[in-house]
Protein backbone atom coordinates (compact mmCIF):
# COMPACT_ATOMS: atom_id res chain seq x y z
CA UNK A 1 0.00 0.00 0.00
CA UNK A 2 1.12 3.52 -0.69
CA UNK A 3 1.09 6.61 1.50
CA UNK A 4 -1.02 9.62 0.55
CA UNK A 5 -1.65 13.12 1.82
CA UNK A 6 -5.21 14.28 1.15
CA UNK A 7 -6.53 17.81 1.62
CA UNK A 8 -10.06 18.79 0.74
CA UNK A 9 -12.00 22.01 1.15
CA UNK A 10 -15.73 21.96 1.90
CA UNK A 11 -18.28 24.69 1.15
CA UNK A 12 -18.67 26.83 4.31
CA UNK A 13 -22.45 26.31 4.37
CA UNK A 14 -21.85 22.54 4.63
CA UNK A 15 -19.53 22.75 7.67
CA UNK A 16 -21.98 20.78 9.83
CA UNK A 17 -21.68 17.81 7.47
CA UNK A 18 -17.87 17.66 7.59
CA UNK A 19 -17.78 15.15 10.47
CA UNK A 20 -20.06 12.79 8.54
CA UNK A 21 -17.94 13.19 5.42
CA UNK A 22 -14.77 12.42 7.39
CA UNK A 23 -16.38 9.32 8.90
CA UNK A 24 -17.47 8.12 5.46
CA UNK A 25 -14.06 8.67 3.89
CA UNK A 26 -12.06 7.17 6.76
CA UNK A 27 -14.51 4.25 6.91
CA UNK A 28 -13.96 3.41 3.25
CA UNK A 29 -10.18 3.58 3.74
CA UNK A 30 -10.14 1.35 6.83
CA UNK A 31 -12.60 -1.17 5.31
CA UNK A 32 -10.16 -1.72 2.46
CA UNK A 33 -7.36 -2.42 4.94
CA UNK A 34 -5.92 1.09 4.90
CA UNK A 35 -4.56 3.04 7.86
CA UNK A 36 -5.23 6.66 8.86
CA UNK A 37 -1.91 8.06 10.12
CA UNK A 38 -3.03 11.66 10.66
CA UNK A 39 -6.41 13.39 10.54
CA UNK A 40 -6.72 17.13 11.15
CA UNK A 41 -9.84 19.23 10.86
CA UNK A 42 -8.49 22.74 10.29
CA UNK A 43 -11.94 24.31 10.44
CA UNK A 44 -13.18 27.28 8.47
CA UNK A 45 -10.33 29.34 7.03
CA UNK A 46 -9.85 32.25 4.66
CA UNK A 47 -9.14 31.30 1.03
CA UNK A 48 -6.17 32.79 -0.81
CA UNK A 49 -8.49 33.70 -3.69
CA UNK A 50 -12.27 33.46 -4.19
CA UNK A 51 -13.65 30.14 -5.43
CA UNK A 52 -17.21 30.32 -6.79
CA UNK A 53 -17.53 33.75 -5.12
CA UNK A 54 -16.69 32.23 -1.72
CA UNK A 55 -13.96 33.64 0.51
CA UNK A 56 -13.89 30.92 3.19
CA UNK A 57 -13.89 27.13 3.22
CA UNK A 58 -13.68 24.28 5.73
CA UNK A 59 -10.31 22.48 5.42
CA UNK A 60 -9.56 18.83 6.27
CA UNK A 61 -6.13 17.12 6.08
CA UNK A 62 -5.58 13.35 6.10
CA UNK A 63 -2.42 11.27 5.82
CA UNK A 64 -3.33 7.72 4.93
CA UNK A 65 -1.86 4.44 3.80
CA UNK A 66 -4.31 2.81 1.41
CA UNK A 67 -4.65 0.76 -1.77
CA UNK A 68 -4.71 2.69 -5.05
CA UNK A 69 -8.28 1.56 -5.80
CA UNK A 70 -9.60 3.22 -2.64
CA UNK A 71 -7.81 6.47 -3.45
CA UNK A 72 -9.23 6.56 -6.98
CA UNK A 73 -12.70 5.88 -5.54
CA UNK A 74 -12.16 8.71 -3.05
CA UNK A 75 -11.11 11.10 -5.84
CA UNK A 76 -14.27 10.20 -7.77
CA UNK A 77 -16.35 10.87 -4.66
CA UNK A 78 -14.69 14.28 -4.27
CA UNK A 79 -15.32 15.09 -7.94
CA UNK A 80 -19.06 14.39 -7.77
CA UNK A 81 -19.69 15.89 -4.32
CA UNK A 82 -20.87 19.47 -4.78
CA UNK A 83 -19.90 20.38 -1.21
CA UNK A 84 -16.20 19.72 -1.92
CA UNK A 85 -14.80 22.88 -3.52
CA UNK A 86 -11.24 21.64 -4.11
CA UNK A 87 -9.20 18.57 -3.25
CA UNK A 88 -5.60 17.47 -3.55
CA UNK A 89 -4.30 13.91 -3.28
CA UNK A 90 -0.50 13.57 -3.22
CA UNK A 91 1.53 10.40 -2.94
CA UNK A 92 4.18 10.59 -0.22
CA UNK A 93 7.21 8.40 0.47
CA UNK A 94 6.57 7.78 4.17
CA UNK A 95 3.75 7.96 6.67
CA UNK A 96 3.44 11.42 8.21
CA UNK A 97 2.19 11.20 11.79
CA UNK A 98 3.40 14.39 13.48
CA UNK A 99 1.18 17.45 13.66
CA UNK A 100 1.20 19.80 10.69
CA UNK A 101 2.86 23.24 11.04
CA UNK A 102 -0.58 24.85 11.10
CA UNK A 103 -1.70 22.81 14.12
CA UNK A 104 1.64 23.27 15.89
CA UNK A 105 1.31 27.03 15.46
CA UNK A 106 -2.21 26.99 16.91
CA UNK A 107 -1.02 24.94 19.91
CA UNK A 108 1.71 27.52 20.61
CA UNK A 109 -0.81 30.36 20.55
CA UNK A 110 -3.38 28.55 22.72
CA UNK A 111 -1.50 28.70 26.09
CA UNK A 112 -0.80 32.42 25.67
CA UNK A 113 -4.49 33.18 25.16
Swiss-Prot record:
Pfam families linked: Ribosomal_S6
What GO MF annotations does this protein's record show?
A: small ribosomal subunit rRNA binding; structural constituent of ribosome
GO biological process: one example:
translation
Gene3D superfamilies (alphabetical):
3.30.70.60
Protein name as it appears in the record: Small ribosomal subunit protein bS6
> Which NCBIfam families does the UniProt entry name for this protein?
S6
Task: Give me the gene this protein comes from.
Answer: rpsF
Q: What is the stated purpose of this protein?
A: Binds together with bS18 to 16S ribosomal RNA.
Amino acid sequence: MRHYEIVFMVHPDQSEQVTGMIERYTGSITEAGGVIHRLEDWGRRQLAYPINKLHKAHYVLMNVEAPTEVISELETTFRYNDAVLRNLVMRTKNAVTEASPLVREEKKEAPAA
